[in-house]
C-alpha cells in the first residue's frame, strides 16, 4: 500500500480530515496538519479503527455543544432607590403651614416671634434612615457627587470633604470621572463596575446573540490578492469558467467584484480585489471580510512590492494564506525561486516543513485549478466557518455607486442571517428598504444567505465601501437609527478628529487610547529598511509597543499614505522624500510623516514621543531687512554698520544673517542696536539705525542684514 496524505485518506474513506486528525491524536500519532504524509503502518491502524467503528472519534463533539453556548446578558435595571426626599418634603409643607399661622397671629407680636424662632431653631427634620453600604455600585461613564452619595447612602457633604482631602474641589452637581468614583468607593470598601451603554447609533445594540445550536456551516469567503498583471482576475475567470476580464477597462479590475461558484455541492465566494497601486484601500477592505486569502504570484516574475503589501494585509487580518504560483506553463517560470523569496516573509511551503499551502497552476490553461479549489474547501473545513441563517441579516458593503437609472446601488456581502427583498435596512450612515436584489450572475433573487454577495437598490444615499449593514424589524426604527448615524457622522466631520501623530502620542498613551504604535518605514535601500525596522521593534515604553505594518524601498507614495490613514500609522522616511501626490494626500488625511537621515535620531524621536519628552518644533520667520549704507570701525567695539531698514523691522533679540551678493556670509546675533546715540529694542521700516554683530566685524557697504526670529509651532 502506497503512502497517502491525511486529506487523501479522508477523501478515500468518505470522512472529514478533522476526524482523521482527531483519531491520530487519540492514537498518539503526531501529525502537523491535513497535508501530512501517512505511513503504511498508520494507514493500516486507521483502517482497523474505522472498520471497528469510527463513531468514537466524533462522539466527543456533541458533549461540547453547551460549553461554548453564549449566555444571554441579563442587564436588569438597577433597583429603584427609596424616595428619601418624600419625608423631607412633607416636613417642609408642615413648616410652611406653621409659618402662615404665625404670620396671621398679631397678638403679642414680638413675644410670639421670639417663641416661634426658638421653636423653629430646635425643631429638627426627622433623620433619614441610614442606608447600608452596598457591596457593589454600577455606573455608566460618570456620576455626580450627589448621585454617588445616593448610591453609597452617604451625605453629599461627607463626600465633598473626602474629595477636598484628595485635592479635588467639587460641588454636589459636579461630574466625577471613573478614577475618582473608584477611589471614593474604595474608601468605603465598595466595589465598582462600569456598565458600557451602547448608543442608539451603534448597530451592535440591535444585534441578537446566536446560540451554538443555531449555527450552520457556511461557504468560505476568499480574497484573491497579488501584484499587478500576475493573473488574479484571469485566475478567478478560470475558476468561474466565465469571462470577466473582457468587460474590465484595460484588463485591470476597476471595482471589487464578488462572485460565487459551486464545486461538488459546496459553494465558495470570491472577492476580486484590484491589484493596481492606487487601490490600496480597496485591497485592505477586501482582507477585512475574508476567511481565506489566495496570494497570486507569477512564477516568471517572483515577489513584487504589492505582493509584500498583500501579505501584510492578510497577516493583519489574521486569515490563512494559500499561495497560487501562477504562469508555471511559461518557459521562464521558476516556482522554486518564488517559494524561496516568500520564505523571507514567513510563508514557508509544507514541502519544506512549513504550514503554507503552495499550489502551482496556470490560470490560462486551467492546470492546477481543481487542486486549488480542493485546497480552499479543505482549509475552510478545518477552519469550521459557521453562521446562523435564521436571523436578521448582517454584513459588509463591498462596493457602492450612484446609478443614473436605479439610484443608490450597493454590493453587499451577507455575513450572517438571511437578507430578503423588502427588509428595512441600515447600511453605514444610510437607510432604506431592499427594493430589489441581483446576484453575481445578474439574476434577480428574493433571498440571500450567509457568505452570499448581492447587489441591492432602495437606499436613500450611497454608503461607503466597508460599511456594516444590519436588517431591522420595522422601517421606523431603521429610519431613526440611520438618521441618527448620519447626524453623528456630520458632527464628527466638523470636529475633524486628527490622526495619530508623534506630537500628541504621549497624551493618547496616557489616556489608554494607544496600545500599539503603527509605523510604515520607507528607506533608500533594503539594508537600511531592515536595520531601521529591527531597531524600532526593540522600543517598548510603558507597555506600548512599536508595530511595523509595512516596509518598502523608494520614495513615499500615495499608496503608503492611504495605508497609513486606514491603519492610523505614522510614516517614517529614511533618506527618502514623499512625492507630490503623497504630500497632498498626507495633508488631506492628516497623516504624520517624519523624515530622517540618521537611524539613531529616528529611535530617539519615537522614544521621546512615547515618553512625552518630544522637543518643541520651531519655524523660522523673517521679520525684516536692513541695508548697510556705511561702516565705522571703533576700537574695542569693532565694526558698526550704519543701516536703513528697508522692510519689516529689526529687534535687539532677533537672529540675523549677513548676505553679500545673494550669498549668506555669516549667521549670528545682534550685539548692539542703536538709533542715534540711544540703545533701542526695535527699529521699524523707513528708519536708520546702527548695528554691531556679536563676534563678527567683516561688514561692508551694500551688505544686507536679514533679521529673523524662531517661533514655536503650535502642536496640532
Curated annotation (Swiss-Prot):
User: Which residues of the sequence carry a binding annotation for GTP?
Assistant: 226-233, 272-276, 326-329
Which residue ranges are recorded for the region named G3?
272-275
Q: Which UniProt keywords apply?
A: Cytoplasm, GTP-binding, Initiation factor, Nucleotide-binding, Protein biosynthesis
Region feature G4, mapped onto this chain? 326-329
Is Nucleotide-binding a UniProt keyword of this protein? yes
Compartment annotation: Cytoplasm
Q: What range(s) does the tr-type G domain occupy?
A: 217-386
Predominant cellular place of this UniProt entry's protein: cytoplasm
Q: Which Pfam families match?
A: EF-G_D2, GTP_EFTU, IF-2, IF2_N
Q: Where is this region: G5?
A: 362-364
Stretches with biased composition (Polar residues):
57-83
**Record's superkingdom?**
Bacteria
Which segments carry the region annotation G1?
226-233
Annotated spans, Disordered = 53-135
Supply the CDD domains for this chain: IF2_eIF5B, IF2_mtIF2_II, mtIF2_IVc
- Annotated stretches, region: G2: 251-255
* Compositional bias ranges of the Low complexity kind: 93-109
Q: Name one GO cellular component term.
A: cytosol
| GO molecular function annotation | GTP binding; GTPase activity; translation initiation factor activity
User: Mind telling me which PANTHER family this protein's record contains?
Assistant: TR-TYPE G DOMAIN-CONTAINING PROTEIN, TRANSLATION INITIATION FACTOR IF-2-RELATED
Hey, which family's this protein in?
Belongs to the TRAFAC class translation factor GTPase superfamily. Classic translation factor GTPase family. IF-2 subfamily.
**Protein function:** One of the essential components for the initiation of protein synthesis. Protects formylmethionyl-tRNA from spontaneous hydrolysis and promotes its binding to the 30S ribosomal subunits. Also involved in the hydrolysis of GTP during the formation of the 70S ribosomal complex.
Q: Which HAMAP family match?
A: IF_2_B (MF_00100_B)
Q: What is this protein called?
A: Translation initiation factor IF-2
Tell me what organism the protein belongs to: Bacillus velezensis (strain DSM 23117 / BGSC 10A6 / LMG 26770 / FZB42) (Bacillus amyloliquefaciens subsp. plantarum)
Q: Upper lineage ranks? A: Bacteria, Bacillati, Bacillota, Bacilli, Bacillales
Tell me the name of the encoding gene: infB
Amino acid at each position: 500500500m502506497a503512502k497517502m496524505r491525511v486529506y487523501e485518506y479522508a477523501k478515500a474513506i468518505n470522512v472529514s480530515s478533522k476526524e482523521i486528525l482527531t483519531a491520530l491524536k487519540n492514537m498518539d500519532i503526531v501529525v502537523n496538519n491535513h497535508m501530512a504524509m501517512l505511513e503504511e503502518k498508520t494507514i493500516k491502524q486507521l483502517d482497523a479503527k474505522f472498520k471497528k467503528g469510527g463513531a468514537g472519534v466524533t462522539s466527543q463533539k456533541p458533549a461540547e455543544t453547551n460549553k461554548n453556548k453564549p449566555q444571554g446578558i441579563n442587564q436588569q435595571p438597577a433597583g429603584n432607590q427609596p424616595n428619601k426626599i418624600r419625608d423631607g418634603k412633607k416636613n417642609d409643607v408642615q413648616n410652611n403651614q406653621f409659618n402662615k399661622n404665625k404670620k396671621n397671629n398679631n397678638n403679642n407680636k414680638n413675644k410670639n416671634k421670639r417663641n416661634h424662632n426658638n421653636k423653629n431653631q430646635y425643631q429638627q427634620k426627622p433623620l433619614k434612615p441610614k442606608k447600608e453600604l452596598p457591596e457593589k455600585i454600577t455606573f455608566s461613564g460618570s456620576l455626580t457627587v450627589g448621585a454617588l452619595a445616593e448610591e453609597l447612602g452617604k451625605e453629599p457633604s461627607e463626600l465633598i470633604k473626602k474629595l477636598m482631602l484628595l485635592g479635588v474641589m467639587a460641588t454636589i452637581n459636579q461630574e466625577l470621572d471613573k478614577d475618582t468614583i473608584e477611589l471614593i468607593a474604595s474608601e468605603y470598601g465598595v466595589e465598582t463596575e462600569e456598565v458600557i451603554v451602547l448608543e442608539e447609533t451603534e448597530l451592535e445594540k440591535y444585534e441578537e446573540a446566536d446560540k451554538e445550536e443555531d449555527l450552520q456551516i457556511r461557504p468560505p469567503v476568499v480574497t484573491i490578492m497579488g501584484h499587478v498583471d500576475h493573473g488574479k482576475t484571469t485566475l478567478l475567470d478560470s475558476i468561474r469558467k466565465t469571462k470577466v476580464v473582457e468587460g474590465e477597462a484595460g484588463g485591470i479590475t476597476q471595482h471589487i467584484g464578488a462572485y460565487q461558484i459551486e464545486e461538488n455541492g459546496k459553494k465558495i465566494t470570491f472577492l476580486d480585489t484590484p491589484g493596481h497601486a492606487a487601490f490600496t484601500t480597496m485591497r485592505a477592505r477586501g482582507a477585512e471580510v475574508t476567511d481565506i486569502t489566495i496570494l497570486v504570484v507569477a512564477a516568471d516574475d517572483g515577489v513584487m512590492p504589492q505582493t509584500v503589501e498583500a501579505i501584510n494585509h492578510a497577516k493583519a487580518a489574521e486569515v490563512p494564506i494559500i499561495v497560487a504560483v501562477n504562469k508555471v506553463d511559461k518557459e521562464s517560470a521558476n516556482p522554486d525561486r518564488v517559494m524561496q523569496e516568500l520564505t523571507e516573509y514567513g510563508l514557508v511551503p509544507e514541502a519544506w516543513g512549513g504550514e503554507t499551502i503552495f499550489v502551482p497552476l496556470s490560470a490560462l490553461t486551467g492546470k492546477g485549478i481543481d487542486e486549488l479549489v480542493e485546497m480552499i474547501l479543505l482549509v475552510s473545513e478545518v477552519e469550521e466557518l459557521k453562521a446562523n441563517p435564521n436571523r436578521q441579516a448582517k454584513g459588509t458593503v463591498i462596493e457602492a455607486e450612484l446609478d443614473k437609472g436605479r439610484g443608490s446601488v450597493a454590493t453587499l456581502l451577507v455575513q450572517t442571517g438571511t437578507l430578503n427583498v423588502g427588509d428595512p435596512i441600515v447600511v453605514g450612515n444610510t437607510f432604506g428598504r431592499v427594493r430589489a436584489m441581483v446576484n453575481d450572475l445578474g439574476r434577480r433573487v428574493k433571498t440571500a444567505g450567509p457568505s452570499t454577495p448581492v447587489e441591492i437598490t432602495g437606499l436613500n444615499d450611497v454608503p461607503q465601501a466597508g460599511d456594516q449593514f444590519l436588517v431591522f424589524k420595522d422601517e421606523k426604527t431603521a429610519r431613526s437609527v440611520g438618521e441618527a448615524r448620519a447626524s453623528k457622522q456630520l458632527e464628527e466631520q466638523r470636529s475633524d478628529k486628527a490622526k495619530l501623530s508623534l506630537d500628541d502620542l504621549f497624551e493618547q498613551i496616557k489616556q489608554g487610547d494607544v496600545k500599539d504604535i503603527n509605523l510604515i518605514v520607507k528607506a533608500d535601500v533594503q539594508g537600511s529598511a531592515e536595520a531601521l525596522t529591527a531597531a524600532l521593534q526593540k522600543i517598548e515604553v510603558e507597555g506600548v509597543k512599536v508595530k511595523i505594518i509595512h516596509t518598502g524601498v523608494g520614495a513615499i507614495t500615495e499608496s503608503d499614505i492611504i495605508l497609513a490613514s486606514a491603519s492610523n500609522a505614522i510614516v517614517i522616511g529614511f533618506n527618502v522624500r514623499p512625492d507630490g501626490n503623497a504630500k497632498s494626500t498626507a495633508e488631506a488625511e492628516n497623516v504624520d510623516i517624519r523624515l530622517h537621515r540618521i537611524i539613531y535620531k529616528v529611535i530617539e524621536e519615537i522614544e521621546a514621543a512615547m515618553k512625552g519628552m518630544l522637543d518643541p518644533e520651531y519655524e523660522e520667520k523673517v521679520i525684516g531687512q536692513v541695508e548697510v549704507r556705511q561702516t565705522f570701525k571703533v576700537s574695542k567695539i569693532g565694526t558698526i554698520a550704519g543701516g536703513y531698514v528697508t522692510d519689516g523691522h529689526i529687534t535687539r533679540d532677533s537672529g540675523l544673517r549677513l548676505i553679500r551678493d545673494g550669498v549668506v556670509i555669516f549667521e549670528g546675533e545682534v550685539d548692539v542696536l542703536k538709533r542715534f546715540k540711544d540703545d533701542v529694542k526695535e527699529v521699524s521700516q523707513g528708519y536708520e539705525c546702527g548695528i554691531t554683530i556679536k563676534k563678527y566685524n567683516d561688514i561692508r557697504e551694500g551688505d544686507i542684514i536679514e533679521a529673523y526670529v524662531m517661533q514655536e509651532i503650535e502642536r496640532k
